[in-house]
UniProtKB/Swiss-Prot annotation:
Known function: Involved in the regulation of glutamine synthetase GlnA, a key enzyme in the process to assimilate ammonia. When cellular nitrogen levels are high, the C-terminal adenylyl transferase (AT) inactivates GlnA by covalent transfer of an adenylyl group from ATP to specific tyrosine residue of GlnA, thus reducing its activity. Conversely, when nitrogen levels are low, the N-terminal adenylyl removase (AR) activates GlnA by removing the adenylyl group by phosphorolysis, increasing its activity.
NCBIfam families found in the cross-reference section: PRK11072.1 (NF008292)
Gene3D superfamilies per the UniProt record, alphabetical: 1.20.120.1510, Beta Polymerase, domain 2, Glutamine synthase adenylyltransferase GlnE, Nucleotidyltransferases domain 2
Cofactor: Mg(2+)
Name of the featured protein: Bifunctional glutamine synthetase adenylyltransferase/adenylyl-removing enzyme
Organism: Yersinia pestis
Region of interest (Adenylyl removase), residue spans: 1-440
UniProt keyword list: ATP-binding, Magnesium, Multifunctional enzyme, Nucleotide-binding, Nucleotidyltransferase, Transferase
InterPro entries noted in UniProt: GlnE, GlnE_rpt_dom, NT_sf, PII_UdlTrfase/GS_AdlTrfase
MF (Gene Ontology): [glutamate-ammonia-ligase] adenylyltransferase activity; [glutamine synthetase]-adenylyl-L-tyrosine phosphorylase activity; ATP binding; magnesium ion binding
Region entry Adenylyl transferase, spans: 449-951
Length: 951
């Protein structure tokens, strides 16, 4: 055993003092002091439970003692009579055994592979013991779940990730998926429940038993987000539902996750065999699957983006050459060849790497290097986490913890340990880069760049610039020169370091070579400089633009076309990662894919880290808006599709925000008890305005109204129980908070809830009955106009049907036409007086006469006027399809409907493009004359009055 360095000797003295103050001070041996000095977790536990130290002396930890964990746990649970006692027993058992594992790990009486086995078996034993105990309790309370033949049904649990691979780290989440074989009902209970309800309740109680923080801590953080549909999906699925999902909707990333999936408990009963056989074809293809290469390239890029996004430094898991890359290398062979090579279907990494060597897929020396690096990194990770039982993979920067890790890894000091670590990670990186065969970065020097070096490195006169920009006017050339000079001056005032300066000197001539030949070179460069100033001290992004010429060209193209995009990139440089794949950049996601893509994005963020979750939501929105804007700028997306994509994106984010708020509220208060007998969450969100009408723009806010379905006497079922309706009020407040909180990536959306019943004076959340009553008896005509553009964007099928029925009933009421005309007209005049342009030489596309708002009012008036006789007019909430319906049902001529639609789309298109230019909706007074004349004619026809025509 190495002598303790000075930092640990000081720590040892402090520990001796603390143990000497115990009622019966133990006799500490040298090895005891070494472990206690290395791990605050172990020393804290043994101070609370000094008898565990005596046990360590009497029964020292053995490498193979994991075989007895289940037996020991059964003894610990033998006297447990209720759930509170179960939670206490599980937590104490976990702490006791984790102390033993940390002890043998530090003293190296167990190897790293054995430590991983111990940690994984401990988790599995506790999951299964808790499941079995709770299953019996649930059967007594609710009856036994049976299939249609009366055969009892079990809960099967898939351990994912490192748990599934038997490679759990010291302080880790556990990723689980719950399943049961067949649908049916409970038997022997007071009333029948279907199996889905039974297993959902069992699953919820199991998660609580493992995950809930008590005075004794917790057992494991449980992450259920890998299940089908993630947080928005059922907690437990039948085999049939699982099979349908993976056959019809399983994504590549879910296939990768399934490689390590393992049934907890090691059972080999028919149900377990059936589930394994069902999943195998999804994971391992029968043919050699080279189609996976591109997906793996995308994953490689995702790793790099993740490191940049989270600002990860010194991270031994996600950093270059880290644990994740070794796992990735191993999965490449499993996914490509695993269907035909059973030896590659191992879940554990080291045996799979050995099979890779035996099959000749990698040189033996590389496999040996990878295996050695993996064991080195996993031991380092476990020692790091054992310091305080914290889930971290970031190396410390304080001398004490650096000394702990260096000593624990067998090195004299931190410098020696760091050198060994660097060598291991470099060896991994070499294999990782070779294996995926990513496109070679374009780092060659274009000969033409030499012409532009002097433009960056020398102080030039205007006459010197003329040969490089012969097409520019003198004024534009002067502006270009001033921009370069100003940027050079700004850079000189910043600390960018020698590497940053070197990369910037490579980048600027390349950038000038692309920008200077452009006819708008002066404008383009002024926009690009804003971005460069934001990243000039962040060498990673400068390197990205140097190494990937295509990315540089995309930046120039987009920033030149849109100052909005330029300012977004300048504020949030992590969006530069989106430029690496031009195919996805100019092709936004399929409308149905936003929810799934966001779900994957959020999976990379700890579920309980609200700050990171908020950041991730905002970063996802910005990245997707950039892709939509790119499609808009290049005319790959017409105006209607731009709004469709912005609306689908908003709906996906609404869904995720509600999920996050719901999880937080349920963790605090439990869920309203009436939900145990009903589908859904008793909560709905109505989208009004541009969201409701599928007409969102780049900077649109969200008009939302919250509805609930909850009886009066309901309470939540958590330890801190509150009134059910109070729960929904706080849920809505939480949702508003998550949208509006300003992080380093800004806010998510501005949310306006003033269209709710009684406006700002009304309750933030209304019951569905109160909403219906208000619409019937108190709402103004303008509120019914707003209802034309309203639709449900979140809620159960029941609430969906209820809202649609209320909306149709209200819109189909008989209305006296003269009065309706007058009320619609008066509201429009009031808006125009308040919002319209007061300047004769300006036309406001939105607010002035003949503009978009007039078109919207015509559509709303026609629905309110004619829906009583033709209820099908209420089907759509967007203006274009409303006009189509008016023509279809012979209320408006096809020619007029088409003309209004053309005017509407043309003006909407201009507003989108003005937004990309960061300009308002005000244009010259002689704009859109033909469109405005058509709108004025239709306004006069339908809402006849002495309304001012378009001049």
């Amino acid at each position: 055993m190495l002598p303790l360095p000075s930092e640990l000797q000081i720590q040892a003295q402090s520990i001796k003092q603390r143990f000497s103050e115990l009622p019966a001070p133990p006799d500490l041996r040298d090895e005891d002091i070494a472990v206690l000095a290395l791990s605050d977790f172990v020393s804290d536990m043994l101070l609370i439970h000094p008898q565990w130290l005596e046990e360590l002396h009497q029964q020292p930890p053995q490498p193979q003692e994991w075989q007895y964990y289940s037996q020991w746990l059964s003894q610990a649970l033998a006297g447990v009579q209720d759930e509170a006692a179960l939670l206490t027993a599980l937590r104490l058992f976990r702490r006791r055994v984790m102390v033993r594992i940390a002890w043998s790990q530090v003293l190296q009486t167990s190897g790293t592979a054995e430590t991983l086995q111990q940690l994984s078996t401990l988790a599995e034993s506790m999951i299964i013991a808790a499941r079995d105990w709770l299953y019996q309790v649930c059967c007594r309370e609710l009856g036994t779940p049976c299939n249609r033949q009366g055969v009892p049904q079990p809960l099967l649990i898939l351990g994912m990730g490192k748990l599934g691979g038997g490679e759990l780290n010291f302080s880790s989440d556990i990723d689980l998926i719950f399943a049961y074989p067949e649908n049916g009902q409970t038997q022997g209970g007071r009333r029948e429940l279907d199996n889905a309800q039974f297993f959902t309740r069992l699953g919820q109680r199991l998660i609580k038993a493992l995950d809930q923080h008590t005075i004794d801590g917790f057992v494991y953080r449980v992450d259920m987000r890998l299940r089908p549909f993630g947080d928005s999906g059922p907690l437990v699925l039948s085999f049939a539902a699982l099979e349908d999902y993976y056959q019809e909707q399983g994504r590549d990333w879910e296939r990768y996750a399934m490689v390590k999936a393992r049934l907890m408990g090691g059972a080999d009963d028919p149900y377990s065999q059936e589930l394994r056989q069902m999943l195998r074809p999804f994971v391992f293809r029968r043919y050699i699957d080279f189609s996976v290469i591109q997906s793996l390239r995308n994953m490689k890029g995702m790793i790099a983006r993740e490191v940049r996004r989270r600002g990860l430094k010194d991270n031994i898991k996600l950093g270059a050459g880290g644990i994740r890359e070794i796992e990735f290398i191993t999965q490449v062979f499993q996914l490509i060849r695993g269907g035909r090579e059973p030896r590659l279907q191992e879940r554990a990494l080291l045996p799979t790497l050995q099979a890779v060597a035996e099959l000749g897929l990698l040189p033996e020396q590389q496999v040996a290097d990878l295996s050695g690096s993996y064991l080195f990194l996993r031991r380092l990770e476990n020692l790091l986490q054992a310091i305080a039982d914290e889930q971290t993979q970031t190396l410390p920067n304080d001398p004490l913890n650096q000394a702990r890790l260096a000593w624990g890894m067998g090195y004299a000091d931190w410098a020696a340990m760091s050198t060994a670590l660097e060598n291991h990670m470099q060896a991994v990186r070499v294999v990782f880069d070779d294996l995926i065969g990513d496109e070679t970065p374009d780092i060659g020097e274009d000969p033409s760049h030499g012409l532009y070096k002097s433009l960056w490195q020398d102080v030039l006169e205007e006459s010197d610039l003329a040969p490089l920009t012969p097409h520019l006017e003198e004024a534009a050339r002067r502006q270009l020169l001033a921009t370069i000079s100003g940027f050079r001056h700004d850079v000189d005032k910043r600390t960018i370091g020698p590497r940053g300066r070197e990369v910037l000197d490579q980048l600027m001539p390349r950038l000038f070579a692309e920008v200077c030949p452009r006819p708008d070179a002066n404008v383009a460069l002024s926009r690009l400089i804003l971005l460069l100033l934001s990243i000039v001290t962040r060498t990673t992004y400068l390197e990205l633009l140097v190494e990937y010429h295509a990315a540089l060209k995309h930046v120039i193209r987009l920033c030149s076309a849109s100052p909005m995009v330029a300012s977004q990139l300048a504020r949030y440089p992590l969006l530069l990662d989106e430029l690496l794949d031009p195919q996805s950049l100019y092709q936004p996601l399929a409308p149905s894919a936003y929810r799934d893509e966001l779900r994957q994005y959020l999976l990379r963020v700890p579920e309980d880290d609200e700050e990171q979750q908020l950041e991730a939501l905002r970063q996802f929105k910005q990245a997707q808006q950039l892709r939509i804007a790119a499609g808009d700028i290049t005319e790959a997306l017409p105006v209607m599709k731009v709004s469709d994509h912005l609306t689908y994106l908003a709906e996906a984010i609404i869904d995720a925000v509600i999920q996050q708020a719901w999880n937080q509220m349920v963790a605090r208060y439990g869920q309203p008890s009436h939900l145990q007998q009903s589908e859904g969450r008793g909560f709905a969100v109505i989208g009004y305005g541009k969201l409701g009408g599928w007409e969102l723009g780049y900077s649109s806010d969200l008009d939302l109204v919250f509805l609930l379905d909850c009886p009066l006497d309901v309470m939540t079922d958590g330890d801190r129980s509150i009134d059910g309706r109070q729960f929904y009020l706080r849920l809505a407040q939480r949702i508003m908070h998550l949208f509006s909180t300003r992080t380093s990536s800004g806010i998510l959306y501005e949310v306006d809830a003033r269209l709710r019943p009684s406006g700002e004076a009304g309750m933030l959340v209304s019951t569905i009955e109160a909403f219906a009553d208000y619409q019937r008896n108190e709402a103004w005509t303008w509120e019914h106009q707003a209802l034309v553009r309203a639709r449900i964007v979140y809620g159960s099928p029941k609430l969906h049907q209820q809202f649609d029925a209320i909306r149709q009933q209200i819109l189909c009421r008989h209305r006296e036409d003269p009065q309706l005309q007058q009320e619609v007209r008066e509201m429009r005049e009031k808006m125009r007086n308040h919002l319209g342009s007061k300047q004769r030489d300006i036309f406001d596309i939105k607010a002035d006469a003949g503009g978009i708002t007039d078109i919207e009012f015509i559509a709303q008036y026609l629905v309110l006027r004619y829906a009583a006789s033709e209820p099908r007019l209420t089907r759509w909430s967007d203006n274009v399809r409303i006009f189509e319906s008016m023509a279809h049902y012979d209320i408006m001529s096809p020619e007029e409907a088409a003309a209004l639609t053309r005017a509407y789309v043309t003006m909407r298109d201009e507003i989108h493009h003005l937004a990309l230019q960061e300009q308002s909706s005000k244009v010259a007074a002689d704009s859109f004359i033909a469109e405005r004349e058509q709108v004025a004619a239709s306004w006069h026809k339908w809402l006849a009055a002495n309304d001012a025509n378009v001049s």
